[in-house]
Amino acid sequence: MSSAAVVEDALEPTLQNILDQKTLKWLFVGGKGGVGKTTTSCSLAIQLSKVRESVLLISTDPAHNLSDAFGQKFGKEATKVNGFDNLSAMEIDPNSSIQEMIEQSDSQGGAMGSMMQDLAFAIPGVDEAMGFAEIMKHVKSMEYSVIVFDTAPTGHTLRFLSFPSVLEKALAKFSTLGRSLGPMLGQFQSMLGGGGPNQEDMFAKLESMREVITEVNTQFKDPEKTTFVCVCIAEFLSLYETERLIQELTSYEIDTHAIVCNQLLYPKKDSNCQHCRVRKQMQDKYVGEMMELYADDFHIVKMPLLTEEVRGTDKLKDFSNFLVTPYVPPTE
């Protein structure tokens, strides 16, 4: 199939479909490091704020670039983005969330704290997954219309998306085990003169966490409620990583039907910049491959490399328009 034919049949090259889908609750933005994920997630959140009642943008990347992008300090509590009434942002770290949970349990009573710690490190990945569960409980209680996740680079993203099923299995196992061993552990604790909350408190906490995770897991697999926007640049490694990401998302049953390709060069025809022309040729090659592979099933959005950094609310607002109105390069 020629690339001209593919382009003819291609889906609309914008993210308008995401803005129109009012049932969406969770939006993930992810890809390889350095491809413009944060700029894309900020731009998407800005566009969503025009059509949805309330939008929350969350960074789960330990590098936390949201503060840099908007030029405003964000932390682990949702804060309104300057210049917006209905857009808030927060930067969280699943690893620190589990540590806080253990410390909180320690302060309530030694036995519960140490058991939480044992649980957290007994199964690989459960520490991060439990941190994720705490975050999701917090986020769900905030009642935003739509939540956009600016995720960590690809490997972390995929681990993050597997947390619900990892945690669901682990907590189900621990809940069952806890109910059989609970009375015996309680007796043992009282023999040692241990005070603090009983094991039932801990298992009730785990159970409530499991319920949240089960619900979130169901929502993540529902294309009416969740979708993933893949971000890449027109280079071999990035395209390869995007294909891997799409395959993994499919295996997790998470909907994905949009690719944002950033940093595209559009040199003027009479440009004397040989480097620009050579690079444009390379980019055209990979954009062609991308169109051939994905244009029938994905909305492919081509975003330009601008002469200035996209930082600050005004520049992000301008840049975000290209997500809904395709960029038209100057003809001269």
Swiss-Prot record:
ATP binds at K32, G33, G34, V35, G36, K37, T38, T39, E235, N262. Keywords: ATP-binding, Cytoplasm, Endoplasmic reticulum, Hydrolase, Metal-binding, Nucleotide-binding, Transport, Zinc. It is found in: Cytoplasm; Endoplasmic reticulum. GO terms for cellular component: GET complex. It is an enzyme of class 3 (hydrolase). Pfam families: ArsA_ATPase (PF02374). It comes from the Eukaryota. Its EC number is 3.6.-.-. One of its GO terms (biological process) is tail-anchored membrane protein insertion into ER membrane. GO terms for molecular function: ATP binding; ATP hydrolysis activity; metal ion binding. The active site is at D61. Zn(2+) binds at C273, C276. ATPase required for the post-translational delivery of tail-anchored (TA) proteins to the endoplasmic reticulum. Recognizes and selectively binds the transmembrane domain of TA proteins in the cytosol. This complex then targets to the endoplasmic reticulum by membrane-bound receptors, where the tail-anchored protein is released for insertion. This process is regulated by ATP binding and hydrolysis. ATP binding drives the homodimer towards the closed dimer state, facilitating recognition of newly synthesized TA membrane proteins. ATP hydrolysis is required for insertion. Homodimer. Belongs to the arsA ATPase family. This is ATPase GET3.
